[in-house]
Amino acid sequence: MVEGMEIDGGLAVQAEGENGQTHTRVSAERLRELVRGIGGAGDHWLVLQRIPDLPDVFAQVWHETGGDYRLEHRLGDEGFFGADLADADRVADLLTGWARQEPGWDMGVTWEPVDLGPREDVPEPSDDARRTVEECVRRRLRCGYDTRAVLTQIAEDHLVGSAMEPLSRAQAERLVDRLWLERVAEQAAWEGVTDPELLTRAFEALDASGITARENFTCCRGCGLAEIGAEREGARGFVFFHQQGTESAAAGHGLALYYGGFDGSEDTTTAVGHEVVAALHAAGLSTEWDGSPARSIVVEPLDWRKRLVG
């Protein structure tokens, strides 16, 4: 896996459309299809962020059928630029160059600055408030599943009802962006495929085989067991780990997986358990399980280095 340009054959970007669909690590061909497809009601725009996401670094395009394409890209504090283009394929080529970070990708286009307005003056929170919220955000960053938007909401809400003054939205955004970039810099030194990525491969294989496999699913075991059946029709079985399990793995412990069938049979649960263990071993992970349908499957040892997405 290579960070920065292309990942496993896909562009190192996440594309989100007005239609509510999100596409992660799309190919250049798929990105072209997405650009060509916008323009209708409820589907006018597409926003691309890098993987991992970087604060105020993105590219976006807006289009209404019959009109030009409005293409914009932001370079963090270095500027925000836009241009009007007539051809969807030209837009797709530019976005692909942006995604690959090709030198000179933006050449040949007349870019105009986009006015960002005055910069907001954001006061610093108290030291106690900052330290308390930082501890919470760092813990969630180690888990690795939250987006910057989710983390910002968590930071804003964390002190509500406490004796300390809660962070404002702007304070929360600034704190999260700073800690996010620290984690991005840390993970840039990681080499090769990490254990969470091996886990994802195993879960993808299980899901493709008819076993509903979900990562970081619900808050706890009880909620997971109550909700997993609604995730997919016609599944042969399920496996998941919950958010508390993620936190435990990120703290250096093993990861408990919960599994079973939908017919209430111990034989089905045991059979699904064996399939889960086989998929994990095929991916290169180790497990502890005695074969009992009453016991969870524990993935360990586990080095929890989950790369951020955004």
Question: Each predicted region: which residue ranges?
Answer:
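Negatively charged, low-complexity tracts enriched in Asp/Glu with abundant Ser/Thr
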Residues: V2-P52
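Intrinsic disorder/low-complexity detector
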Residues: I7, L11-Q14, N19, E64, ...
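Well-ordered, non-membrane alpha-helical segments in soluble/globular domains
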Residues: E29-L31, D195-T200, T269-V276
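Short secondary-structure junctions
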Residues: W45, T212-E215, G284-D290
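Intrinsically disordered, low-complexity regulatory segments enriched in Ser/Thr/Pro
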Residues: P55-A88, D93, V239-T270, H274
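Short, compact, well-ordered microdomains
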Residues: G82-T110, D267-P301
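An N-terminal amphipathic alpha-helical segment
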Residues: E215-L255
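Short, structured secondary-structure boundary patches
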Residues: E233-V239, V299-G310
